[in-house]
Amino acid sequence: MKTPAPPPDNADDAAAQRGKIRVSVNLVSVLTSVLDEHNRPAPDLPREAFQIFEEGVEQKLEVFESETQQPLDLALMVDASLSAHKEIAFEEEAASHFIGQVLRPGDRLSVFAISEDVTQLVTYTDDIARLQGAVHRIPNGAGTSIYDGLLLGSRTLEHRGEDRRHVIILVTDAGETTSVADFDAARKGAVRSGSLLYTIVIRPVKNESGRNTAGEHALETITDTMGGAMFYPDTVQELDGIFDRINRELRTQYRLGYYPTPRGPANTYRTIEVKVSGNYQVRHRKTYLTGPQ
């Protein structure tokens, strides 16, 4: 158990401590992925190449980290209905390989199975063997509660601390069937947690008439809002490459931070835009929820 900090020695120390808390709460941190025309990460760009806006008003960039070393908390969410897929072994092996590659000192990962219910198979840990074992034991499920899964994953990440990067990786066929939560609740929960979402859609058929295109479009909207990326592998053999791409992107992210001017009202959604000079593709979360004043 963490030992609580001793009380401040005097009133000046107490005031300084309160000031630090206010500064930490007010800082808006924005993880930003910058890709070149070949969809490769673009590292080593200078601070001067970036502009950040809130509600259309340019903000002063107070924090700039290239290839941020901020530790990761990752929620790996696997659609249990994929367990019936004839090539499930490839999917499990790709996810297992990703777990072994992505975790660095200080990082933590949790595995969730999404069926009619959402089950956290392993809580956040750096125990690679436990995590890989859980991926290989995803049970077959009847329903698919994707929105419930996103909401639960977001809530677990929201309480993991603001000094860490929060990431959800969802592997699914996009066939939402049994959630209690709806689209709006899932998106709001994701925004509140400040998480990035990477969605990998395993399509049982390529023809649109046999796919859940409405589910795919809903996930595209949430993923774009959260600043992540969608992937549609044509074969499960492509999964290794997709997981490697996500890993590279997470290791080459820029972390930007600013203190909003003017500050928005309490508990309201504020839009964010990041611009980078040059011919680049830029991804970042599009909005955040203000805290209490």
Q: Which residues are covered by each model-predicted region?
A:
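Scaffold/interface architecture of coatomer-like assemblies
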Residues: 1-293
